[in-house]
Every structure is written in structure tokens, then in C-alpha cells.
């Protein structure tokens, strides 16, 4: 299946000069969505994963069904103020400033093998911050899986040394 056919391209969104890749059409098509999830599940199967971690919000959309299919748990990564219990956090550089991500301090147990799942790999800031939190909690990042990688934005540099699966590539 050619998943690229299920990605909408919106020019100048969310701001002038940005090309947005919208996964909504992929999610709206049961066959395409299921195919994408199965591809990530297949990637994860040999890695002996204990936990899926997904950054908000689209990491939930992709990561939760993967966790369900694997019969394992899911841990969310969120912006400050969105998680009710004790959290750990990481500040990370974005294109125009600094942002913060958080996860529950008890989300990952030492030694757990974790797969990070998100919709998009661009500059790698989000995944790098997520890796930092998982490793701070004693987890082992066994891999990263993305629906889309935007080429030319150096996201791979952020995950250098980590195994990664990307289902589609688009110009960045």
C-alpha cells in the first residue's frame, strides 16, 4: 500500500513558508490506518518491547493502537500541566524558542524496553527530549517509529545511535 497517497499537503500552514503534512486522511481510511499500525507492530515485534511512549497529540493516535496490538502499556509525553501526578520534565530547543515536555515519574521502570512512536520526525527535538526522559527513568530505548520523516531537517541526527523505522519520507 502506498501510504503517501493518504497524506494531505497543506502549504503555508500553520504559518507562511511551512508545508504541513496532515495524517487525517490516513486515519480516516480504515485500511490505510490499519496497514500503518501493522507496519509499526511488525517492526516492534522482534525488539521485545515492554512499553510504548508517545508524545502528544498525534503520538497518542499512532502509539496507542500499537501498544494495544502488542498487548503492552502506553505512556504519554505531554506539555506541562497536563499530567496529574509527579512528573519529570525536559526543556528542549524548538525552531523559535524553548519548550518543555513531561512524563509521569513512574511511567517507565528501570530496564524496561521502550519504543517511541510518533507521527512525524522533523528536527528531532521532541524525540530527543523523550529519549532523555526515558533514559533518566532507567528505561532502554529499543527504537523509534514514525509515520513520516521530513527530509533535510536533520531529525536523524537527534536519534543517532538509536534504531528507527519510518514509513514515509517527504521533503522538509
From Swiss-Prot:
It catalyses: AMP + diphosphate = 5-phospho-alpha-D-ribose 1-diphosphate + adenine. One of its GO terms (biological process) is AMP salvage. Keywords: Cytoplasm, Glycosyltransferase, Purine salvage, Transferase. Its EC number is 2.4.2.7. It is an enzyme of class 2 (transferase). Gene3D superfamilies: 3.40.50.2020. PROSITE patterns: PUR_PYR_PR_TRANSFER (PS00103). Pathway: Purine metabolism; AMP biosynthesis via salvage pathway; AMP from adenine: step 1/1. InterPro entries: Ade_phspho_trans, PRibTrfase_dom, PRTase-like, UPRTase/APRTase. One of its GO terms (molecular function) is adenine binding. Pfam families: Pribosyltran. Catalyzes a salvage reaction resulting in the formation of AMP, that is energically less costly than de novo synthesis. Homodimer. Belongs to the purine/pyrimidine phosphoribosyltransferase family. This is Adenine phosphoribosyltransferase. The lineage of its organism: Bacteria, Bacillati, Bacillota, Bacilli, Lactobacillales. The gene is apt.
Amino acid at each position: 500500500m502506498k501510504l503517501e497517497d493518504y497524506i494531505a499537503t497543506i502549504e503555508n500552514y500553520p504559518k507562511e513558508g511551512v508545508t504541513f503534512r496532515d495524517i487525517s486522511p490516513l486515519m480516516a481510511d480504515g485500511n490505510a490506518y490499519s496497514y500503518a499500525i501493522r507496519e509499526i507492530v511488525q517492526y516492534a515485534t522482534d525488539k521485545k518491547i515492554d512499553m510504548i511512549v508517545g508524545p502528544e497529540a498525534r503520538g497518542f493516535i499512532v502509539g496507542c493502537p500499537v501498544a494495544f496490538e502488542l498487548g503492552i502499556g502506553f505512556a504519554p509525553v505531554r506539555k506541562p500541566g497536563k499530567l496529574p501526578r509527579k512528573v519529570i520534565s525536559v526543556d528542549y530547543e524548538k525552531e523559535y524558542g524553548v519548550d518543555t515536555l513531561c512524563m509521569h515519574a513512574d511511567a517507565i521502570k528501570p530496564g524496561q524496553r521502550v519504543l517511541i512512536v510518533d507521527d512525524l520526525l522533523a528536527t528531532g527535538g521532541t524525540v530527543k527530549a523523550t529519549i532523555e526522559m526515558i533514559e533518566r527513568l532507567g528505561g532502554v530505548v529499543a527504537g523509534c517509529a514514525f509515520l513520516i520523516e521530513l527530509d533535510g531537517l536533520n531529525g536523524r541526527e537527534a536519534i543517532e545511535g538509536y534504531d528507527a523505522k519510518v514509513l514515509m519520507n517527504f521533503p522538509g
